[in-house]
Design a protein with these regions (language model features):
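An interfacial alpha-helical scaffold signature
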Residues: 1-158
């Protein structure tokens, strides 16, 4: 819960930066770090694939100009999203199609696979929405002192 609150705060900070402000790199790094460090994330399962084939594949959706897999930083956020959507993500026997991905599976399987496929993610929604690529998330988290984009970034990471 504490990490989720910090993540929301980081996203809010990022959204307040004026266009052209170079601090976006730092803000992005902290969002990516908080997201990466969550013990588990939650996805909404595609109802059609679940009912017809029994597959638990995260739903791919659009939000304004962004398209990606919908991911939530807490179960409560995923639950509220499903509730607002009515029957779109609820089965006939009233099962809410919310899946959980634990940290290990997220790091070792989910992110690398979707980064390779060049997919995006939509984190949370509405005012807390943050959209980016799995590829960039993975690159930031694999970064170390040998992987510096420029001197300014190097100063931020120290």
């Amino acid at each position: 819960m504490d990490k989720d609150i910090r993540l929301v705060e980081q996203i809010a900070t990022f959204k307040r930066l004026p266009k052209g402000d170079d601090r976006w790199r730092v803000a992005f790094y902290y969002i990516a770090k908080e997201f990466w460090d969550l013990e588990e994330v939650f996805v909404i399962i595609d109802k059609t694939l679940y009912e017809e084939q029994g597959l638990k594949i995260p739903v791919f959706r659009e939000y304004k100009e962004a398209q990606g897999f919908q991911i939530f930083s807490s179960y409560n956020k995923a639950y509220k999203f499903v509730e607002k959507q009515g029957e779109l993500f609820v089965t006939e026997n009233d099962k809410k199609l919310i899946g959980r991905i634990r940290k290990g599976a997220f790091h070792e399987v989910f992110v690398p696979f979707f980064a390779e496929q060049k997919f995006n993610y939509l984190l949370n929604e509405e005012e807390g929405l943050f959209a980016d690529t799995f590829e960039r998330l993975l690159a930031v988290m694999e970064a170390d002192e040998e992987y510096i984009v420029d001197e300014e970034q190097e100063q931020y990471l120290k």
